Amino acid sequence: MDIEEWEQRHAEAFYNAKEALPYLDGMFVAYNSNIDAIRHLTEEDLSKLVGFFDESDIQDRVAAYPREIAEPLDFVARLLISMREGKAAEVPAYTADIHEWLKEHLGFDYARMGGQAGIISNLLGRLGLKKVVAYVPWLSEEQAEYFTATGNILHPKVENGKVLLKPPGEAFKPGIGSKVNWILEYSKDMNVTCAGNTFKVPRDNRLIISSRPKWLRLDMDKQIYEQLDTLLPVDGAMLSGYQMIKEEYEDGSTYKDYVENSVKVIEKLKSLNPELRIHVELTSIQNRLIRKAILTEIVARHVHSLGLDTVEVANALNVLGHEELSYSVIRKGENGIMSLYQGAVQLMKDLDLERVHVHSLGFYICILAKGHPLTLKEHRDSLLFSSVLAAAQALNGNIENLAEAEAGLEVPVSSIGLEDLENFQLYCTGRKLCTPDEFEYGYVYGSEHDAILIPSKVVERPKATVGIGDTISAGAFVAMLAKIKQKHSGK
């Protein structure tokens, strides 16, 4: 694989997608947005945090692997686990106690739009789409201020029994509280010492403490559901936030009620526009029962596309009964990319999907069901476009418009990602999934699926890591939909 060739392909793909985007009528994005309080940690910050506790207590809590943040010691333990492995993690907190403790003992550098649906809505708005309909069940006045003022982002609001699309600043629910998540970012090569043990952080990443207040419900307003046609025309929907569903609620309802309602929304969207494609963006889901329910009851058979990272592939495989493959994905090693590929194929089969898009540091894998309306090159272009967007976001911290996104073209293609793909070539050619020439283009042909593998652009020292995965998935999905619309128009 020639790195210069891939640089050229990125440029060509970016301009092809730019040309296709105006063909889209609009996108629907739901459900989760919040305010992110972001702190970039230094070694001094870490020493201070560790210093608040007895180090043997920290070690015990690390070994216990807390799955929620019930007290500050849980937070420090999960932070050390995340830093040791260099892996992103999202851990829920069900009270405001940790929020108050962090404000008092650490503080944040700045606040911005958070939550997958919020981040994706703002990105699509800035890419200049005609219309982006965002829907957040808990839209507060403060939260509404974090939507970008591009004029093309709208939110449904019920007025006198009628659903109208209005700018978020005119569509919020009065008197509702805001959901605030803490994002603790850390850098590669930071030295960490606790209880006599020292390690070096292997890569830039972050720990997210996800606020899950008791009043939070992942649901759609009944009147908005009944008048869902007011959202149209839209060409696609990107849905996320299902990780917020709880097993049981104080009012006696359970996760089953919210799963059922979520599926009803998906099915109604599809009935209103049979051409509509729906993408679910996965994230870290600590609760295994909820993780399995999301995959087998919401995603399987109901949506077209799934976006996720390496850890999420492993976690999904695990609850679907593929423990050995899951372990192989998470362990990485020399066969890591082969396991990741096999895992993505398995997810497509198990969940009956049209498309599975996996983003890993340095490369992306996209598995496609046979009979998809685009050529492999057109699919590849959509992935390369998203690679440029992600590079621009990592480089500058955000993307204000398509012109600014071009900065991503200056970021080099990852040589490590390219090397990972070259190691995978023997696996593909050995199984006759492609010829060496086809692999040079990133194309793989299975008996029941096709696949595209591309090396991505990677910023050595990113300004921010939050939202990069959402940018990759959203950029690729809308570029794909735009190309389908452009082809249908015959232009």
Swiss-Prot record:
The keyword Metal-binding applies. CDD domains: ADPGK_ADPPFK. Keywords: Cytoplasm, Glycolysis, Kinase, Magnesium, Metal-binding, Transferase. Its cofactor is Mg(2+). One of its GO terms (cellular component) is cytoplasm. It is found in: Cytoplasm. Residues 4-486 form the ADPK domain. This is ADP-specific phosphofructokinase. It comes from the Archaea. InterPro entries: ADP_PFK/GK, ADP_PFK/GK_arc, ADP_PFK_arc, Ribokinase-like. Its EC number is 2.7.1.146. Pfam families: ADP_PFK_GK. Mg(2+) binds at residues 281, 312, 470. It catalyses: beta-D-fructose 6-phosphate + ADP = beta-D-fructose 1,6-bisphosphate + AMP + H(+). One of its GO terms (molecular function) is ADP-specific phosphofructokinase activity. The active site is at 470 (proton acceptor). Catalyzes the phosphorylation of fructose 6-phosphate to fructose 1,6-bisphosphate using ADP as the phosphate donor. Binds 1 Mg(2+) ion per subunit. GO terms for biological process: carbohydrate metabolic process; fructose metabolic process; glycolytic process. Pathway: Carbohydrate degradation; glycolysis. It is an enzyme of class 2 (transferase). The keyword Transferase applies. It comes from Methanosarcina acetivorans (strain ATCC 35395 / DSM 2834 / JCM 12185 / C2A). Coiled coil: none annotated.
